[in-house]
Regions:
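Periplasmic/extracellular loop-to-transmembrane helix junction in inner-membrane transport proteins
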Residues: 3-45
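C-terminal transmembrane helix and the adjacent membrane-cytosol boundary/short C-terminal tail
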Residues: 63-64, 127, 131, 143, ...
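Cytoplasmic-entry segments and transmembrane alpha-helices of multi-pass inner-membrane transporters
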Residues: 56-96, 124-128
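Glycine-rich helix-loop "coupling/hinge" segments at transmembrane-helix boundaries
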Residues: 98-99, 178-212, 232, 236-241
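Faces of alpha-helical transmembrane segments in polytopic inner-membrane proteins
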Residues: 52, 56, 81-89, 109-127, ...
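Short cytoplasmic-facing helical segments at TM-TM junctions of multi-pass membrane proteins
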Residues: 125-164, 190, 194
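Loop-to-helix entry region at the N-terminal start of transmembrane alpha-helices
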Residues: 33-41, 93-121, 161, 205, ...
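Transmembrane alpha-helices
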Residues: 43, 148-181, 208
């Protein structure tokens, strides 16, 4: 749990007195629609970014210099992917219509921008994940008759999965936070509850947006933790030793 999440979580009970359930009941359909929009805009870019990043990360991890270090091209790739994440989200959201030719309020701007952020995070996580698998294991698998594809699919990916899934957790929670910024340019999400609540001085609207954003982050993070345990059962066995 991040420091910001901890602060917000501890503040929610203090602000509960400002929450009016009548407002929640009257606006239930709108809240559900914004929640689904938020979930879609957060999850789809993670899937797209990860799918694009993993082949790049694997290639970068396997490209080693003769002494075991990284080649200049690989270092440049990692630097550029890290640099992408330093671009402020609101600036990238505003830049997207110029690049894509879309409307400023199109959800596609948020989807593409967050796919870029997810890609940059997952390239770094993927390289670290594949680097964590010793080359000797891959070479042993090849010596036993595994094809390169079988060695990657049955050895490299399962052993790299814990680090990859940790990267997915970071990317997912980060996207849930950044989707809200899209409300500033008119893209509907739970962030719309923040902007509308502030503009119309409706504390209930703000509190619902905060609570649902936090809840979504906790639920998705928990699901990814569960997925990690399911896909890597040997780690639980190692911890019990």
């Amino acid at each position: 749990m991040s420091v910001l999440q901890s602060v917000l979580l501890s503040a929610l009970p203090l602000a509960a007195g400002d929450l009016h359930w009548e407002w929640v009941a009257d606006n239930g359909r709108r809240i559900l629609e914004l929640t689904l929009n938020h979930l879609y805009q957060a999850v789809v870019p993670v899937a797209v970014g990860a799918a694009l990043a993993m082949p790049v990360a694997y290639y970068a991890s396997r490209r080693r210099a003769s002494k075991g270090g990284r080649r200049p091209g690989t270092l440049t790739l990692l630097y550029l992917s890290s640099l992408l994440y330093t671009i402020p989200s609101i600036a990238l959201f505003v830049l997207m219509p110029l690049v894509l030719g879309t409307s400023i309020i199109s959800p596609m701007n948020v989807l593409v921008a967050l796919s870029v952020y997810s890609f940059s995070l997952m390239v770094r996580a993927g390289v670290d994940a594949f680097d964590s698998v010793p080359d000797s294991l891959y070479e042993s698998a090849r010596a036993l008759g595994y094809t390169p594809g079988q060695a990657r699919r049955e050895l490299m990916v399962p052993l790299a999965a814990p680090v990859i899934l940790s990267g997915l957790r970071v990317a997912t929670v980060s996207n849930i936070a950044m989707v809200s910024v899209g409300a500033l340019i008119g893209v509907p999400s739970l962030g719309t509850l923040f902007t509308d609540g502030l503009a119309r001085d409706i504390p209930s609207e703000i509190l619902v947006g905060v609570a649902l954003s936090l809840g979504m982050a906790f639920v998705l993070d928990g699901l990814l933790m569960l997925l990690t345990r399911i896909l890597t059962p040997w780690r639980a066995a190692e911890r019990r030793r």
